[in-house]
Amino acid sequence: MKLFVTGGYGFIGSNFINLASNMGHTVMNIDSVTYAANRDNITMRPNIKNVEIDIVDYNLLEKTMLDFQPDAIIHFAAESHVDNSIENPYVFLNTNIFGTYNLLQASSKLDNNFHYIHISTDEVFGELGEEGFFTEETSYDPKSPYSASKASSDHLVRAWTNTYNFPATIVNCCNNYGPNQHKEKLIPKIITNCFLGNDIPIYGKGENVRDWIFVEDFCKAILLIVQNKSIALNESFCIGANEELTNIDLTKKICEIINNRFSLEHNCLDLIKHVDDRLGHDFRYAIDASKIKNELGWKPENTFEKGILKTIEHYKENL
């Protein structure tokens, strides 16, 4: 298949391209190469082409897409750091909302029978209490500029589907972790600071709960959706691995693994420092992934313990 991928130099996009290209798919990657991108994230193969354009540049986006004539469009490109969205929301609105609009408009001009896969987040649903899970039926209740921008883009896709019979699938996923993630994010920051001996900042008491999935497992779920258009078309899927951890337990677990596996001059647990909580910090996210498991036969292959060891090794080699 011919796959048109946005944000392929980023964390999840690069892992997806490496997986899909290795399986023989032809990939066109477009990326604006922001600070969070890294060209070295992609293992270059003859069936990958990279074009450095911004999805807010409609004319270039349209020309590139129409020249390529993809079978599927997988939209990963997004501004995603919640803290940055609080400081500078405009960038998030521009990329996540208007960039998505441009993709919808450009892909609507394709000649072939394409499939648009919109990658979103569980943060659009707001927060959970101590019980319950997000599902495909959960109402939207975004709490940050980031999640509001992603919720808006989800609604745009649904509007295009309902109004123009646009062939789309929406994916809402829990927190990904694994190789190629920018070091500003929580797990890379914990691992990197452990090896460097730097403080590990934890918001508030660290009691906020997140559901974690190893990025390779998520990418395999996306590829299943691409390969099963007849089932996935005009549907939404919530994807998670049922690996819930409080931020403080996550941090301690990683610190203890590194303490036990590597001879460092310091105890990583001593690096943990509690800082003022983030504005609008949602308490808990957790996903019920029954739909994709039942309809497409997907299941995660990596436990958190297995995935985090691979992740630690990656960041140790790329300090």
Task: Locate each region found by the language model.
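Short aromatic-enriched loop/helix-cap "lid" or pocket-rim segments at secondary-structure transitions
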Residues: 38-42, 128-131, 181-184, 250-252, ...
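The catalytic Tyr-centered alpha-helix of NAD(P)H-dependent dehydrogenases
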Residues: 142-149, 179, 183-187, 211-215
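Residues in well-ordered alpha-helical elements
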Residues: 59, 71, 83, 90, ...
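N-terminal Rossmann-like NAD(P)+-binding domain of SDR-like oxidoreductases, especially those catalyzing
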Residues: 1-176
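Residue-level signature of the cytosolic catalytic core of signaling kinases
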Residues: 44, 53, 57, 130, ...
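Hydrophobic alpha-helix immediately C-terminal to the catalytic Tyr-X-X-X-Lys motif of short-chain
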Residues: 152, 156, 160, 190, ...
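C-terminal substrate-binding subdomain of Rossmann-fold SDR/epimerase-dehydratase oxidoreductases
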Residues: 22, 194-319
